[in-house]
């Protein structure tokens, strides 16, 4: 039925369409310098000498039209959404036990049949107590652990139990106040039962993913509260059956499975299950990586048709061949990007990824490098630095990686003064920063570092090149590249090919080459990174133990001795599995030779992997086979070119080759080799796909449509070279979202009836269009469709010419007045309008939308056209008017996306607030403790860390708690990251093409070419 369709969460499903622009805006930067006018990259098919983007034939974006008269933008249902109140419960205090802590067990009998489940409970006046709930049939047991024993036995307790259930069609919370009285009997088993119930709650909440701490605590709580006993045999058996710690193949997928693996590892550590991988007696040389070949890049260069000289990347001569590389022509561009990233790009990307923690990587790496962003650097940096490159040896920036800057110095005096100023600032903030020197290859490397590794600047000078790194090994590798002692990126054939394929100068250029990818997926780095992940879990354990101590005792621990005495930390956990010692002081990050819990030592600075275990070898080989299934034959480079001019940022990305089994291959199945030129639009959002003549999808759709209808005419043989889907920028978009969304507003008391849903959908300004290559075929198909509809539902559907616009007839297909009652009630709500105009057929839900599309398609310069070369194969473009329907819909979508990660963020906040109650009134201490124990800080959708704890759980002042949420008007404030984005983003255009490369390889090599153009407003001062 229409009313029970999955439309309720439709806004969440379409968010990626709205939100892709946020991630792409990473490279936009305010008011950048004008790029040089050299040739732009070639697009489309075999590389051509004439630079042309995929959209090159498109006319410039027309000025935005005057918006039509519309109704008001929909209003969100704002305010607090309190739990529904249940009848009060009366129960008994059945058991208790006193000792180092007080335990009480309460029991309540519930009315049967309401379908609600008890989830959370709180006891009045017991803020420091831990309370666990078990719901069994018609009984609820509430168990409390009071960390500080009272002198008198409690014979009366009051509080609240919160239930999950349904009210009408809405899931919601219910609050049941309770009182429990009686004289309890002592029960020595009460701590064990409490540990079992709390362990289950810590691992399996229904309000979002739990943190790794919760998994550790779920395992360790048994030993901490069960008189030193281990977890029940059934729990241990279940954990051993999973064998997560020894399933090293999962650890090889370090970039995709880190969080879930960390949680599983911590649960096993909490249970005391120590995974072993055996003796390291297998030579790394015997572990084979993926059998992937290099492209014949030199021969491919010879096949290029361009006569334009290749671009130059002089700083690539200072970078090792197996490092990633980013170059900026002007330091001001880089500084603008960093400022934009701090203001809104990183927070919005964080929301899109649904990550619960903000790691503040920019601040971390600035501190490690001894660098900073001052007003003087932004104003005068270009006089000190001609250009700069940033490079590194691996992609593990979140965990901890090497980052090296190579500055081409224009004024040594200004440059030295600026770096000295920044280093002095860090020496003031970080105690113990000392100076040292090492000599490498005749060069002096000056090191400034503190004992904890928070600052570790390595600096060297070679001619006019200044090298600044956070890694000694990386600094040495860069010096070796400069001196020619190691292969340099500038000499690599893949980079030389990319620079020759698309010559021209650009404001910024980024490159990932064959050798970098080969190192990342090779056995040395993969096995080393897997060991780092295990070491990171071991470094996190003391901090988690300190938090668990606070949960159980109502205060933070004073020493590690308290942790071991309380049973929350095993002395052996102050060492890694490889024997390396772990130093830990409660309140600070644990540290060892592997680094700190909040920032691991760069992988390149660790001892090289020479021997591995048989388990590590087998795990890597399993990973290698899976990797090779995607990259069938070759590993290839990725090049990114960035140009900034005025308020527009252009990002051009080329990836070689297409990856088997991915969404890109799915798109290629649709488009084939067909291309389309798509003129710019000035209103709304649309996506245009080229449709290849002989693609498998076209043939399959044609076969299915004729087979389904039984009519030969009802196929898609009339379909031309492109199809389009889109929407105009109208307030009706907000009407539909306001009806269905329950992420950014209070839910409706009752789900709307079907006519109301149909009416909202029928007002949407959406459209579909398709190129027509056979008018006769289209007429036959429409006639066949009309006959079929009358056969299926006689007299229920009407087809009528309702009007003309620009002399183009418009047809309305709707529900007839003579239709049955169950259908006729939708007659005034839903209809489809269509017209054939400009060689295309257009379908809409509103006549006014169709008229706009007729205006657009009547102008041949504004409609897509097929192309043999140039153009693109997929184009997406969107424009938003400030405060308009699309703008508001995007705002709501961003806010809803930001709130998806809040359940997990609240769990992290709960871990800190219960682990050290003193941080509730000290925001700086909250952030510091979160960084020390988690390596990041949980933040609200507004980027704040102002969480608090109350009986119904963790809350923030704007959005409330999970049990008692609040829904503020949007935007929440002008200084939030989402508001900053909405003030900046004006339009986005993305194009995708699959281009042939000049190679004799079989099958023929095709690259993925993507181009983004973003238009941004002025940055706030």
Where are the regions a protein language model picked out?
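Low-complexity, Pro/Thr/Ser/Glu-rich flexible segments characteristic
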Residues: 35-66
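Bacterial N-terminal signal peptides that target proteins for export
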Residues: 2-19
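Bacterial signal peptide processing site
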Residues: 30-33
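C-terminal motif of bacterial Sec signal peptides marking the signal peptidase cleavage site
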Residues: 26-28
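Sec-dependent N-terminal signal peptides
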Residues: 20-24
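Signature of soluble extracytoplasmic/periplasmic domains of secreted precursors
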Residues: 62-904, 910-920, 924-1021
